[in-house]
């Protein structure tokens, strides 16, 4: 039985309409009893994986209509197709409206390249409202707005990718190729395939935004990184 949207929680799993996560990955995440939401056709994915969402959000043009009878306890939120944004944006707005503060996005990478690229930009677009990360069976992706510190095993591969233009004033600790008040520039200076040499890893950013792309480490360490508090820049 899924957690009801009326039950108090600030943590959600959101399933998109892209390539499905493994059943094991989803089961690991659901052990923490988050609110389970899906964006339109993500409902079909959840059905195939044997899970029932609390809420389905979108224009509902990609959902198997029989699921309304299969899931009588689920809430269905139809947002007009004319409303701006993708179904994933619509479910993120819904999550914010019901008090979600932190969410893991599944089924939003792979498949169509344009969808994957757009979904990555949502980590920035919703940064002031939601602490988001993207997870698939290979890696975890999250935005580093200013600084983050997390435990990681020695030898783990991670990458730092500028999200929107230059990222400057970057300083790292615990990596084979450290950065000290340096810049990463799209198409010029990259932060691809670095390696953990000491734990915890610390990453600080002066200006701009970075994406942290890190190999999955197993359920326990994945959840720790999902919960890691990234210090936000002053929005004032």
Predicted regions and their residues:
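N-terminal nucleotide-binding beta1-loop-alpha1 segment
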Residues: 2-19
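Short beta->alpha connector loops
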Residues: 18-21, 42, 61, 140
